[in-house]
Amino acid sequence: MKYTSYILALQLCVLLGFSGSYGQGPFFKEIENLKEYFNASNPDVAEGGPLFIEILKNWKEESDRKIIQSQIVSFYFKLFENFKDNQVIQRSVDIIKQDMFQKFLNGSSEKLEDFKKLIQISVDDMQIQRKAINELIKVMNDLSPKSNLIKRKRSQNLFRGRRASM
């Protein structure tokens, strides 16, 4: 009985090992390359706790997580932009960016361009600040769930009206 437990445990480890290596995607090796380049596995990296992991644990609902994930992805795109001229890690950065693009933006190049535009907006520019304040009411209304509900009901009523007239 004791040997059976060991054999089952060994099989489980082998299965988990294989599924882990195949399920990681092409970015896994590239992340390991970046970790090595930045010496990110050094124990001093853990000082002060994690940057994102604890925050992500606090956000359970999918829609809420998307909000936090967008900020995290924005951070990584800015970080990668700082290393765009570094030939040593460029391939790794490009592969990771492409995979992140596929996962977060579903491969939509329009969404990527909009996302990049938002990242590039400078909050120090007075003209940008003025434009942002001018658009604040529209942005706040767009954030309001009530306005989305009204739009949805209006759209449903239009659709029902068309169906009734057919």
Curated annotation (Swiss-Prot):
Record-stated family? Belongs to the type II (or gamma) interferon family.
Which of UniProt's keywords are assigned here?
Antiviral defense, Cytokine, Glycoprotein, Growth regulation, Pyrrolidone carboxylic acid, Secreted, Signal
Q: Name one Pfam family in it.
A: IFN-gamma
Which tissues express it?
Released primarily from activated T lymphocytes.
Q: Name one GO molecular function term.
A: type II interferon receptor binding
Full protein name: Interferon gamma
Record GO cellular component, one term? extracellular space
Q: Which residues carry this modification: Pyrrolidone carboxylic acid?
A: Q24
Q: Where is the signal peptide?
A: 1-23
Glycosylated residue positions: N39, N106
| UniProt subcellular location | Secreted
BP GO terms, sorted: adaptive immune response; defense response to virus; humoral immune response; positive regulation of autophagy
Q: According to its UniProt entry, what is the function of this protein? A: Type II interferon produced by immune cells such as T-cells and NK cells that plays crucial roles in antimicrobial, antiviral, and antitumor responses by activating effector immune cells and enhancing antigen presentation. Primarily signals through the JAK-STAT pathway after interaction with its receptor IFNGR1 to affect gene regulation. Upon IFNG binding, IFNGR1 intracellular domain opens out to allow association of downstream signaling components JAK2, JAK1 and STAT1, leading to STAT1 activation, nuclear translocation and transcription of IFNG-regulated genes.
Question: From which organism does this entry originate?
Answer: Cervus elaphus (Red deer)
Binding partners and assembly: Homodimer. Interacts with IFNGR1 (via extracellular domain); this interaction promotes IFNGR1 dimerization.
